Amino acid sequence: MPGVANLALSPRKKKGQGLKPVGSFPKSVSPYKVQDMIGNVWEWVWEYYQPYPGNTFKTPAYEKKQIVVRGLSYMGVGHFSKKEFLKVVSLKARASYREHLNPLARKKDVGFRCAKDRPSFMERVFRVKADQPDK
């Protein structure tokens, strides 16, 4: 995805362009002005790897206290044939895609994602905390 994200683009070129500063891919800016949500580094989010609500799928990874990483990295997606490589990248190259990782693992292609909760409707409309008592 040249110009859009820092990702490996072929199985022969296993890596993207190495780490890049935030903002190096202006075509990837979201409507909320968030940058680099895919590519560059996997982003550690404040979440343990668990099934989504209502999902009955089971995996041993749910029992291991793995952390969630999102966004894919410049290091590639694993070992796939040329035919399958871009298909796999296109499936995983999205901000919502998640993988799991041991929280003690040290990887050069893992960073973290800063985020904050969306304000409640009342906070957005009245610009006050909804749980504050009237004065």
Where are these regions (language model features)?
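Flexible, glycine-rich phosphate/dinucleotide-binding loops
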Residues: 50-51, 102, 121-123
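Functional-site microenvironments in short loops/helix caps that host divalent-cation chemistry
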Residues: 1-94, 132
